[in-house]
């Protein structure tokens, strides 16, 4: 066997298993890969293991055999498979979170805050996410463990806080799944009045089928759907520029320029400005999934830094540029916007095309919205099931949810998430469904800010502990070029967003302070606090000191020649540093 190119900090005396060519981030045929594969009783916590599957079976035998538990049932329950390739990670990063928050939710933001508020707030949230994803990228490359930032919060902040944000993160995507299925059905009203339950059934079955193929199915579907979303959004940007410049013969408005945005840049004064933060946060929901997917990536050390850098371009192009153009083309007073109408089949993107009197294209983009919604629904089941699986493996959720079958599927965690999708059928209950979905949406409303703030705080504590213990950043596979200050800025932004939403929830637009509006806007906060205090009372956990913080378990180190971060650190000149950081 050739000498290893990577150094893995595992004590061979403690883990005397044989060294084999194996799976950490590469195919088994890669002679440059060296892996220490421990025995079943000597499992290294946080590592992802390949499950053995029987050979010489026919299709039906293999199908049913795949549902059996993995051969090695580990304490942390991590038996997921590394099947996400680099191209999957790239598209999850670029287009994974582009969905109803951008295409539909931006309509209510435009109606509530006006185009200037939308552009400013989405840009601020984009900057915050830029810092957050880089911090997550550094942590995920160093610790590519199942559960992502939930495990980081348990380790670096406090077990009680990890428990609270873990359940908060799970419930966010758990309740969003039926909401996305309902949005799919409602969007079809643009063409037909067929009962929404029919469309819910079709898309629910589709998502269930995707999950039967495990993480490989998720990766392939997300790759295809994200590609379609990216192409469609790029096409819209080009078309919107042509419309604004008066290049569409069917548009009687001619050259538009900045007429619309100058007329009413802001709506509802400061309250309107603050109200957009929640919708913007929902629009960026899922950006952090690329870190969660690290546990199932073939080579997180190579694919994660590249995927992390793509987030900047997604924010800059697909969010900021497209919303600037929406502000130039769609009036915030348009009664068809989501904020002013119960008709969920329209979005500002569709309205911008319809106002130019272009036939056919509004239907095409409405189809893109449906594709985006299916993509988000697919991501919801992936994210919720993996988070529940990780919590169960650590004892923060019922243990049976840690069950993993031979294909690496967290079967029971996945099943409970998919079963909750049937809750979408309550849409047939009329007005009752609106009330139910309002409260479900309230659970996920501001939960993202707790998750993203925790990621930044984990990175800050991680860096401080590294410094306190005299560790060098040279051993890390990827180093965030924004450093600890980038995470501090990201954390501050999250706190400001929580404060802004508290203000709007307490003093809602167009009405007096009332308990109903407050809890529909801020319900996630008391839920997180209740989980945190409850765990503290039960377990009496404590915040670990920086000098005693465990930095070794699950840590992956790499020689300098194999590190993506070396390119950034060695870059000469400011502009080259910028290029290496973003490309």
From Swiss-Prot:
PROSITE patterns from the UniProt entry: AMINO_ACID_PERMEASE_1 (PS00218)
Subcellular location per the Swiss-Prot or TrEMBL entry: Golgi apparatus membrane; Membrane
Record flagged with keyword Glycoprotein: yes
Mode of membrane association: Multi-pass membrane protein
Record's keyword annotation contains Metal-binding: no
Modified residues (Phosphoserine): 22
GO term, biological process aspect, one: amino acid transmembrane transport
Glycosylation site list: 340
Family of this protein: Belongs to the amino acid-polyamine-organocation (APC) superfamily.
Protein name, entry field: Uncharacterized amino-acid permease P7G5.06
Organism: Schizosaccharomyces pombe (strain 972 / ATCC 24843)
Lineage, highest ranks first: Eukaryota, Fungi, Dikarya, Ascomycota, Taphrinomycotina
């Amino acid at each position: 066997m050739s000498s290893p190119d990577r150094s893995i900090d595992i004590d061979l005396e403690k883990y005397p298993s044989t060294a084999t060519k194996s799976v950490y981030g590469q195919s088994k045929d890669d002679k440059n890969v060296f892996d220490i594969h421990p025995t079943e009783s000597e499992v290294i916590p946080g590592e992802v293991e390949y499950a053995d599957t029987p050979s010489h079976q026919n299709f039906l035998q293999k199908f049913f055999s795949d549902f059996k538990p993995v051969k090695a049932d580990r304490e942390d329950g991590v038996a997921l498979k590394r099947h996400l390739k680099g191209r999957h990670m790239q598209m999850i990063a670029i287009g994974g979170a582009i969905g109803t928050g951008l295409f539909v939710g931006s309509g209510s933001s435009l109606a509530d805050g006006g185009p200037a508020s939308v552009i400013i707030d989405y840009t601020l949230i984009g900057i915050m996410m830029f810092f957050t994803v880089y911090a997550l990228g550094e942590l995920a490359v160093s610790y590519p463990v199942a559960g992502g930032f939930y495990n980081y919060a348990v380790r670096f902040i406090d077990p009680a806080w990890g428990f609270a944000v873990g359940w908060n993160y799970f419930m966010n995507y758990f309740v969003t799944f039926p909401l996305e299925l309902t949005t799919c059905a409602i969007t079809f009203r643009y063409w037909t009045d067929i009962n929404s339950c029919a469309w819910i059934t079709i898309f629910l079955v589709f998502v269930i089928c995707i999950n039967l193929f495990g993480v490989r199915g998720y990766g392939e579907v997300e790759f295809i759907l994200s590609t379609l979303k990216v192409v469609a959004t790029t096409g819209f940007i080009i078309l919107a520029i042509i419309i604004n410049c008066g290049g569409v013969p069917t548009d009687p408005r001619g050259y538009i320029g900045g007429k619309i945005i100058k007329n009413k840049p802001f709506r509802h004064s400061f309250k309107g400005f603050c109200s957009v933060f929640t919708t913007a946060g929902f629009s960026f929901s899922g950006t952090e999934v690329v870190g969660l997917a690290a546990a199932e990536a073939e080579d997180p050390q190579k694919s994660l830094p590249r995927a992390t850098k793509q987030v900047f371009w997604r924010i800059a192009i697909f969010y900021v540029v497209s919303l600037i153009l929406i502000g130039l083309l769609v009036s915030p007073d348009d009664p068809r916007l989501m904020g002013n109408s119960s008709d969920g089949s329209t979005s500002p993107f569709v309205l911008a095309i319809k106002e130019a009197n272009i036939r056919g294209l509004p239907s095409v983009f409405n189809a893109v919205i449906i594709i985006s919604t299916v993509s988000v629904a697919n991501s919801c089941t992936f994210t919720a099931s993996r988070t529940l699986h990780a919590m169960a493996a650590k004892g923060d959720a019922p243990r049976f949810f840690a069950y993993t079958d031979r294909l690496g599927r967290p079967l029971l965690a996945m099943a409970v998430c998919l079963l909750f999708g049937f809750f979408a059928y309550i849409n047939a209950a009329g007005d009752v469904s609106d009330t139910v979905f309002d409260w479900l949406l309230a659970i996920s409303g501001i939960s993202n800010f707790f998750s993203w703030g925790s990621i930044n705080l984990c990175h800050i504590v991680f860096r401080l502990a590294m410094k306190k213990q005299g560790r060098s950043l040279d051993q890390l596979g990827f180093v965030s070029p924004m450093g600890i200050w980038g995470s501090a800025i990201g954390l501050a932004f999250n706190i400001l967003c929580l404060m802004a939403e508290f203000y709007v929830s307490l003093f809602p637009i167009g009405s007096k302070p009332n308990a109903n509006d407050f809890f529909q806007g801020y319900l996630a906060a008391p839920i997180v606090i209740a989980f945190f205090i409850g765990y503290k009372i039960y377990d009496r956990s404590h915040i670990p000191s920086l000098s005693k913080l465990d930095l070794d378990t699950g840590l992956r180190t790499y020689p300098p020649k194999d590190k993506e971060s070396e390119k950034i650190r060695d870059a000469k000149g400011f502009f080259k540093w910028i290029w290496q950081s973003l490309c």
